[in-house]
Every structure is written in structure tokens, then in C-alpha cells.
């Protein structure tokens, strides 16, 4: 499809909305390359995927996907034998884990018997790699750090490092808290050049043997490594080197393991991107309240209450637009500013959305065509003061359109023939429309030339239309009226604004009879339309009342049978109780008669006694009624009240009843959403006590964290004082094994902030630093992450 029409219809804004919902790099790629297509089968597949996504969004909240980066460059590096770093491996690991999670998710959907049209075929293409997935998961953390579980050797080395660091801290404590503590600038232990040191006052350097590794900015403090711990520091450095070597070995091993599966991994990442795209389409459909269009291969377009998707839903006016079945050309006449241009753009944009596999902003059962291409000449300006250059530009555009259209094209022409002499412009417009009709393309053209009103009546497969204007308010309603040509409202408007009737009457006399007759005909048509609309609304109201009455009667009829069954059950239970008492009495009588026969020789036969008892037993009625659908529904129905936990069956979501809206509906709180739900859509849920044992979480305190806070506040400090505190604080935080700290320096003149960041830039223990989020101080605080 030509890109000019996409720009004219602002198709890129729809894509921008989609991109706001995508969370993977490959999903963003899918959206960036999205364009309308003209193959009906492929369009239907895309729409089926969107439909599946909408169903999953409604029932499950969407397909579970994490944020995923573009791993294509990493896999290309592996092809040339490069070793990936931890961060790159972590990104690949996320793709592998997401693949497994998505496959499990769709397996669960299949067990739940959720019918999907297209996505199962897509998901079947995934290649899960459980062994490689687990290997990366157990070796690389999400931030790219190599885990202790990556290898036995690495775990042993890190255990040794921790033990050795403990020994060094213990030995250093004898300096910071012993007799020589008075020679220190501060009783702390810090790190310089990857070695543990203590801050010694310049004048007391002779009190300590060892090596000076650094000094403070003022030169008053020397950072010395005491002779007594030099051997421990040497051993520590050796273990650190061995740790790094083991990490590099693990990275190389994992990179080598990925090599044979790189194509499958890339294919999985691209499939995840497609599912992310489906999620985005579903969320866009939800945001726009869009529906699934029906594809009509014969290009019969029938949009029911179509809305422009880029206009505020609370302000946009919906219109019915139909073309291609009963007529192939619509001529929209009438004055400017009535909404003709928006109507053209609505038709075009809704059509390209459908041909892109997106849901459309129209009511359900709306039909769209499959056009080979869509062309438009739509200007942004509608001023009557158009000059020749504007007319020439429009004509050049229309000439190109006429060269390219075929019988499967849709053409949208705004203010056809404008910008030149009205008589010539109208003649050109008629000739252009005739040529488009000869080709067989569908066309919607707007114009304010009255001559084209006659055209709509004289040409086959052509119909007039107009934008409604409310003379009472002197405002356009933006409603499209198919079959009614537009008419000038100049006389009515002038009269309402106060122009003397004599002037208006004289103006009417100056009009030729043909124009006057045409306006009268249009007025009659509009009156007929309004009468038909009034009748339609009355019939619709009666139909609604009849539907409500039918529903009430059905409910009462159902309740009657339920009550009847209940009363019959009670009656039978009562009758059975009477019969049981009679049987007991009968047993006593039979026993007495049997005794009389044995004792007195009476002529009473045994079978007569048994038959008599059987007849009594036949009076017993079953209290359990036969199964019937009405009773089963009645048994399932439970009395609902405010505060009840319920299941909304159509959404598969639980909620709580807030209030009863009417006899048929309740207001239900589902999470942060309140919705009006019908009674038949609610199932009362039992409140289940959560007796699961509480999970106890064990916390481990960092070694030196008891005396070091995770935040340093420098506000109100002088520059030199602040920088000295930063130096001491960073060392203390490293000793306390903090992974991340925050330095609050305020905004002010920025001198301390700049000094802090220059210090962090030069410190080799700092992995990265960045400003805090806006809600946590913004550029008034810096978050520091250590290696």
C-alpha cells in the first residue's frame, strides 16, 4: 500500500500507540515494520491472532512476557567465536526462560479448554531448551553477575575469599581499636589498589611499617598497608585473580554451549516478539474499545457507528458508513466545517487498521473490504481562499491517483474541484468521478458544489450524502446522512441571526427556480428522514420494553417452577412421614394378627398380610426430584448480598459485590476496576480460610552494616568537608559489603554534585552511578552501584 496514504491518514500515530504497549525489542520491530496488506487469508490470520490476544487479555490478563532486549548482536558474536559477558548471557537466559514460561502458559490454556484460533500454531514453533536454560539460570544472575553455583571451584574460591577478608578485618581491628588508633585520621579500614589499608596521619607514618598506597587530597592522611597484613593481602589478591580466571572460563563454556542452539534461540526471540505484538494489539483494542471486523472479499464495506480512533472518545461522533454493495460512489455535499474531512479519514484509517490485522473502532459485525490500495487527496486547509497553486497541487495528486487505481481500489477525495472557478470546478469533479466509475473503484468524495447533488441522482451506483447541521443551534452535529444531499442553510442561519425577512425573501427570489426546487427537495428528504428516525427510535424503545418484559416473564416463569418443585418436595416429605407412621402401625397390626393366628388358629393367610403391607409401602414418595435444567439452575443460584465474594464467569475474575444496581445487575469491584455485571454472570464463592503456614524469611546482616547507613547526606556541608566524607563513606560501604548506596548532595550550585561524580568516576570499586528517580530526589541524589 502506498506510503502517502498512510501519512495522510496518520497511520503512524496508531503505530505509536501500539509501541507504547510493546515490552520486547522484537515486538517493537514487528510494530515498526507493520503495514496494511491486501491478501484476505493473511489478513484473517492476523485478525485471528488479535482475537486470541483479546480473549487472553480478557480472561488471563495477557500473555506473560518480560522485558526482553535484542539478542541478535550477541548471537552474531558467538558465530565468530567471541565470548559473551555476563550481561549478554543474562539477556539470552531471559529469552530461554520466557520461552519455557510461554509454552507452559499455553499448555494450561489448552487444559482450561480455551478455544484459540491462531496462536497455538505459532506457539508450536517454539523450541524449548531446558538443559541450557537451567545451566544459564544457575550460573548467571539477572544483572549479569556470575553466581557461586556456576561451578564448584568458583564457590570454593569465594568461600576462601570471604574467610581471608574476615582474617584481614580482624587483624586490622587491632590497629583501629588498639593502642595505635590515636595515630589514625579515622578508626576505619579502607581499600586502595585492591588492598586493605588504614588512614594514617602524615606525621605518624613512621609508627607503621608497610607500604603507602595513596594519600588524601590535602596530603594530611596516608593510606598505608601495614607490614603485618601484606602477606594476607597478597593471598587475597591471588584468590581474586583465580576467581576472575574461573569466571572467564565459565563465560567461555556457556558461550560455547549456546553456539549450536543460536538459530533456535533467535527464532524463539522473534516468536516472543510476535506474541508481544499480539499483546500490544489486544491492549490497543481494549483502550480504543475496538471490535473484530468481518472481512468481505467483495469489498462491501459496512461500518456500524465508526469512530475516528485518534479523536477523544468522549467527543467523537460515530457514523454508519457503507459502500461497495448498493453503491460504489458516495458524494458528500454541504458546507465546510461540518465534518466531511473527518468522515473520509475515519473510513480510510479504519480500513487500513483492519488490513493491518488490528481491531477497528466500530460496533461488532462491521464489515471491511480488502482493497489493493487506498488513495486520497485530502487537504489540511478548507479555506475558500484557495489559489491556483493549491488547485494545481490537488490536480497533480488526482492525476497520479487516476493512473494507479483499479477496480479493487478505494479513493477518498476531499473538496473535489475546489480552488478554481466554481462552474469549471464542478464540471471537473463530475468528469473525475465518471472516470473513477469507469475503472470500477469505490470512491467517497466531498464537495460544496451544488451541481454534484444532481450527479448523485443521475449516475448509477452513486448516492448522495451530507453532514447534518442543526439550524436551531447553528452548529454542525457531525452526523453523516446517507441518501440526503447537503443543502445550504444560509437563509435559515441569516434569519435566526436577525437579518430582516424582507432581505431574505428578496434573496430567495434571486435564486433560479432549479436551485430553489433542489433545496425544497432536500428539505423534504430531510424531513422524511427525521420522521423515519423518530419512528425508528419509537420502535426501538418498544422493542426494548418488550425484551425487558419477556425477560421478566421468563424469570417469573422460572421462579414459578422452582417454587412448585420446592412445595412438591415439602408435600411429599410430609406425606412420606405419614406413610412411615402408617407402616409402623401396620407392622404392629400384622405382628398382632400373626400372633393371633399362631395362638388362636385364625384363618389368615401369610401372603395376604404381606400384600397389605406392600400396598402401604407404595404410598411412599421419593423426595428427590428428577433432574431438570430449571431446578439445576435454581440450585446453583444463591442469594447475593453486599460484601459477597463472587466469580464473574465471563471474565474468569473474582470480585466483591459493592451494591445492587437493579434487580438484574450488581456493581462488582474487581481489583481497581468497578463494573456493572448481570446476575446471571455471577457465582457466589465460598470464603476459604488461608491456613497456609507463614513463610519465615531469614535475613543476614552485612558485616559492617551496623555502623554504616545505606545513605550519605551531604546537604549543608562545605565542599572540602563533603569530599572527605564521601571518601570515608565509600570505603566504609565497601567494607560493609553494600551493593548499592545513595549519596544525597542536593541541587544547589552543583559543585558538590560534580565533585562527587568526579570522585566516583575515578574510583575503581564503583561499577556505575546515576541520578535517583524523580520521586526519590532526581539530580539531587546519586545512586552508586559497586562491583
UniProtKB/Swiss-Prot annotation:
Any one GO molecular function term: ATP hydrolysis activity
Domain Smr, residue spans: 712-787
Key word Acetylation present: no
Domain of life: Bacteria
Any one GO biological process: mismatch repair
Alphabetized UniProt keyword annotations: ATP-binding, DNA-binding, Endonuclease, Hydrolase, Nuclease, Nucleotide-binding, RNA-binding, rRNA-binding
Role played: Endonuclease that is involved in the suppression of homologous recombination and thus may have a key role in the control of bacterial genetic diversity.
Record NCBIfam families: mutS2 (TIGR01069)
Protein name: Endonuclease MutS2
Origin organism lineage: Bacteria, Bacillati, Bacillota, Bacilli, Lactobacillales
